[in-house]
């Protein structure tokens, strides 16, 4: 009865190929996620480039503004090591997700939870995605509400206080009705590749401005940069970069770094719509997106740190506002970052809506009415949270730390350990165990830091 051991009934939710190991690996790398030959023959499906832009948009958000502060508290080499480690772990966790999708023949994070732990597993994964993405979207909209009026007022030549376009709530509602809701209504995440490419170029522009402005801010820093441009001195301790630096502030860098490459809720929907989908092709999409995001992260953090050194603000643009208050490039990059954050909202809206639909309407066929009403309901919820819960980022700090840790580290490692038929001492299972352990430690550490921060305040 050797054959029965290799059937799908061998263990609920796990498919094991009857091919030889070498042949199985090769087939797995290039096997399609879905049996969709008619689609392959047509031109439908998102291209490799648009899929890369979508993954990068899912990765990069407002967190890029805090990375220079992280470098100041860890040192250049310490930051580089942590950033590279997190990027590799994120890539490996995506690798495990894709491998499980191939072997279980499912196409969603939620269904992986179903295969691993039954209906409770599916509900837990879907609930985690919904909470994480609603928290992220609300936080992004709160940034828009608080920062966009200030950015607009800096651009205007005279005082326009009291004008409707400087009212954060009014701007937020207009933007959500005119931009966020229409983009969120799109039925396929691949359609957002064009807006994601725009968001990525905004981030690249931000990094370029940070590089250029390194030579516009004097060192040692003075509040009157115009009169001190020629007083630049690298002879003082204030202007010497630290390769390694550890202090009590350094521990706060770990949660920020750990969540720098969170894209896992969007990876599988992007995978499903990829043209000629295969595990190898989607892994290349993910690796390309992570590598480009790593490059933008590192360049902006490095030159942001080398501009302000120990005086770098927790949000990098605040430093430029203080020392270059009327600089045209800085004002432009503020608007670009805000629009980049805005264009991320529809992308992370897609997995949240999908998770909600899978919990409530999994047995129903697609309906435009149901699709539109669910989209509208989610948009109303995140707008209300952004308007009426001013400390939304603090509220979702604890929840976000735990849900992000689960989605990046815990779930991929745990599901692989549960579903895999490999020997426990195999490299993949040991890697999955390491991922699970890392997630548990990072998640617990993040929660402790957030609670201590609340107590100190």
Curated annotation (Swiss-Prot):
Transmembrane segments: 48-68, 70-90, 112-132, 171-191, 192-212, 251-271, 289-309, 328-348, 372-392, 395-415, 432-452
UniProt record, GO biological process: amino acid transmembrane transport; glutamine transport; inorganic cation transmembrane transport
InterPro entries xref list: AA_transpt_TM
Pfam family, one: Aa_trans
Membrane topology category: Multi-pass membrane protein
Molecular function per GO: active monoatomic ion transmembrane transporter activity; inorganic cation transmembrane transporter activity; L-glutamate transmembrane transporter activity; L-glutamine transmembrane transporter activity; monoatomic cation transmembrane transporter activity; secondary active transmembrane transporter activity
CC per GO annotation: plasma membrane; synapse
Glycosites: 234, 284
Subcellular compartments: Cell membrane; Synapse
Catalyzed reactions per annotation: L-glutamine(out) = L-glutamine(in); L-glutamate(out) = L-glutamate(in)
Residues carrying Phosphoserine: 4, 7
Top-level lineage group: Eukaryota
Main location: membrane
Entry's family note: Belongs to the amino acid/polyamine transporter 2 family.
Its biological purpose: Amino acid transporter with an apparent selectivity for L-glutamine and L-glutamate. May facilitate glutamine uptake in excitatory neurons. The transport mechanism remains to be elucidated.
Disulfide bonds: 219-239
Residue numbers carrying N-acetylmethionine: 1
Record protein name field: Solute carrier family 38 member 6
Keywords, in A-Z order: Acetylation, Amino-acid transport, Cell membrane, Disulfide bond, Glycoprotein, Membrane, Phosphoprotein, Synapse, Transmembrane, Transmembrane helix, Transport
């Amino acid at each position: 009865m050797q054959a029965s051991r290799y059937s799908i009934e061998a263990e609920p939710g796990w498919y094991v190929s009857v091919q030889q190991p070498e042949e199985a690996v090769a087939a797995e790398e290039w096997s399609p996620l879905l049996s969709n030959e008619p689609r392959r023959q047509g031109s439908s499906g998102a291209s490799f480039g648009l899929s890369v832009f979508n993954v990068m948009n899912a990765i990069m958000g407002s967190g890029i503004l805090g990375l220079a502060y992280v470098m100041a508290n860890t040192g250049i080499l310490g930051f580089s090591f942590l950033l590279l480690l997190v990027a590799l772990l994120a890539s490996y966790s995506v690798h495990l997700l894709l491998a499980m999708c191939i072997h279980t023949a499912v196409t969603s994070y939620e269904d992986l939870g179903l295969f691993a732990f039954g209906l409770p597993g599916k509900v837990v994964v879907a609930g985690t995605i919904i909470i994480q993405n609603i928290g992220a979207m609300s936080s992004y909209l709160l940034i828009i509400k608080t920062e966009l009026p200030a950015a607009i007022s800096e651009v205007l030549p005279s005082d326009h206080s009291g004008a409707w376009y400087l009212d954060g709530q009014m701007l937020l509602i207009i933007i959500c009705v005119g931009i966020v809701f229409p983009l969120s209504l799109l039925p396929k995440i691949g359609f957002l590749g064009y807006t994601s490419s725009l968001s990525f170029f905004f981030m690249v522009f931000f990094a370029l401005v940070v590089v250029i402005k390194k030579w516009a801010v004097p060192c040692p820093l003075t509040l009157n940069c115009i009169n001190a441009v020629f007083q630049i001195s690298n002879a003082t301790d204030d202007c010497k970069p630290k390769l390694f630096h550890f202090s009590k502030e350094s521990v706060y860098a770990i949660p920020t770094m750990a969540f720098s490459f969170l894209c896992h809720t969007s990876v599988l929907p992007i995978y499903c719509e990829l043209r000629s989908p295969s595990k190898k092709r989607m892994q290349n999409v993910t690796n390309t997106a992570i590598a480009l995001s790593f490059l933008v992260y590192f360049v902006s953090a490095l030159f942001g740190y080398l501009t302000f050194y120990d005086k770098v603000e927790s949000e990098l643009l605040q430093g430029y506002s203080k020392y270059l208050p009327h600089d045209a490039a800085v004002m432009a990059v503020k608007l670009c970052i805000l629009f980049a954050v805005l264009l991320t909202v529809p992308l992370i809206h897609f997995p949240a809506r999908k998770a909600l639909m899978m919990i409530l309407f999994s047995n129903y066929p697609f309906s435009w009415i149901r699709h539109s009403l669910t989209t509208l309901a989610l948009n109303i919820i995140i707008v209300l949270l952004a308007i009426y819960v001013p400390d939304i980022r603090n509220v979702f700090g604890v929840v976000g730390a735990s849900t992000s840790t689960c989605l990046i580290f815990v779930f991929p490692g745990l599901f692989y350990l549960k579903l895999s038929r490999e020997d426990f001492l195999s490299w993949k299972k040991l890697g999955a165990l390491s991922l699970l352990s890392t997630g548990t430690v990072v998640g617990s550490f993040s929660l402790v830091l957030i609670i201590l921060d609340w107590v100190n305040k």
